Amino acid sequence: MPRRKQSHPQPVKCEGVKVDTEDSLDEGPGALVLESDLLLGQDLEFEEEEEEEEGDGNSDQLMGFERDSEGDSLGARPGLPYGLSDDESGGGRALSAESEVEEPARGPGEARGERPGPACQLCGGPTGEGPCCGAGGPGGGPLLPPRLLYSCRLCTFVSHYSSHLKRHMQTHSGEKPFRCGRCPYASAQLVNLTRHTRTHTGEKPYRCPHCPFACSSLGNLRRHQRTHAGPPTPPCPTCGFRCCTPRPARPPSPTEQEGAVPRRPEDALLLPDLSLHVPPGGASFLPDCGQLRGEGEGLCGTGSEPLPELLFPWTCRGCGQELEEGEGSRLGAAMCGRCMRGEAGGGASGGPQGPSDKGFACSLCPFATHYPNHLARHMKTHSGEKPFRCARCPYASAHLDNLKRHQRVHTGEKPYKCPLCPYACGNLANLKRHGRIHSGDKPFRCSLCNYSCNQSMNLKRHMLRHTGEKPFRCATCAYTTGHWDNYKRHQKVHGHGGAGGPGLSASEGWAPPHSPPSVLSSRGPPALGTAGSRAVHTDSS
């Protein structure tokens, strides 16, 4: 029965085969010794099946070799798959039948029975042994290869991904392929359009787990959650900036725990310095409001008295968050509902610590914030600057959000609907105020009497009875009042129809001389009709 061929045959003895010095095959006992046959890496197999078929008793035939009775050379015979001359075969190592083939040298890990580790992607050798990943760092540790960076030629934008750079270049080219189907809004990125559509639907998918706060942007939620993180950090000794809360310490990576892995020094040169450097002397990049810090001359006019603090705070004085229309206030300080509950509970809620903890404060009112862009936006309220104007009417505002809210008056859009009745409106604050009718809640209480109401404007108007302030003064006669509705009714006596001040049209944004004109006019000029007067009354509060 024929034997199965071996996958890795060992050198064997072949009786009856002898190789003489003339490279001819003669029959005779002895060992098989061929200088050109048994080279390292060649597998020789006996074809015993063919021997049985031919009936030869001598094992004279090898795989690829045929016996030549005439004594021809092996290198010139066509039976060889490729010929080897004496010169070519001399480069190999001659083996005898008794010699053993030496195995290639193994690494220290293979000698212990371990598998070799992954090869280095740069040099192909074992990881940690090549010149690219060998000991060359300051501490003798391996050096990590630098990552490929894609940088913008027009600005300092840098990214590790080419797709991010392509998306960023649309910012410079002005291309805005994503357009809103309800308004003229267009954006270069789909994520911005998705965020914008929530302004039409009123959707607020991001909710704070610690309080009822909800918003439509993840960035606003993260900024809000800093108010729950704890006490603020110490102020900067150079510019006085104070962060809202310290960032939590990043846990060290496993590589850092075992030992610091230094990067190449030239890697740090690939990334530009994107940190904000504020020069000494404060926030000089904010709008210059030097003309507002005078002695009341210029815009306010000589002899004008300051407006009572009850009328013009539009932001929470506890956390700096901008208050919506109809949101609560207290005597002498407007505050949001969360800060009011925090003060009622003795400040144990972990909320903001007050205006003293803010890095940027307004010099004209108690407004303070952690962010310089919020202060710059707030200063437009005092300066009277209104860069956002309506294309359908003379309305103008200092804030883009107010303009968007105003445009719903023209379009008739009412995205906010009451779940208990058919009421719908275009302003979220109006929906909240309407919801108090169903709940019967009256969160606005007077600290001097038992008066309470469900709208902040009613509380502000009520507080004028205690203070005796009458900010609305007629320029034609000596009439003064504390209510805008009464003032409009009085203007009909002079034939102005309540649309504006004496001799001024509604588009000029009249403000009573008893108060700084920039404050009352910053929320939009009076408009014709009942809707316009209601909007002015809300803004003046």
UniProtKB/Swiss-Prot annotation:
In the retina, expressed in the outer and inner nuclear layers, and the ganglion cell layer. One of its GO terms (cellular component) is nucleus. Residues 1-118, 492-541 are annotated as: Disordered. Residues 103-115 have a biased composition (Basic and acidic residues). A zinc finger (C2H2-type) spans 150-172, 178-200, 206-228, 360-382, 388-410, 416-438, 444-466, 472-494. Keywords: Disease variant, DNA-binding, Metal-binding, Nucleus, Phosphoprotein, Repeat, Retinitis pigmentosa, Sensory transduction, Transcription, Transcription regulation, Vision, Zinc, Zinc-finger. The modification Phosphoserine is found at residues 85, 96. PROSITE patterns: ZINC_FINGER_C2H2_1, ZINC_FINGER_C2H2_2. GO terms for molecular function: DNA binding; transcription cis-regulatory region binding; zinc ion binding. It is found in: Nucleus. Residues 44-57 have a biased composition (Acidic residues). Belongs to the krueppel C2H2-type zinc-finger protein family. It is linked to Retinitis pigmentosa 58: A retinal dystrophy belonging to the group of pigmentary retinopathies. Retinitis pigmentosa is characterized by retinal pigment deposits visible on fundus examination and primary loss of rod photoreceptor cells followed by secondary loss of cone photoreceptors. Patients typically have night vision blindness and loss of midperipheral visual field. As their condition progresses, they lose their far peripheral visual field and eventually central vision as well. Binds DNA. Can associate with the proximal promoter regions of PAX6 and SP4, and their known targets including ARR3, RHO, OPN1MW2 and OPN1SW. This is Zinc finger protein 513. The gene is ZNF513.
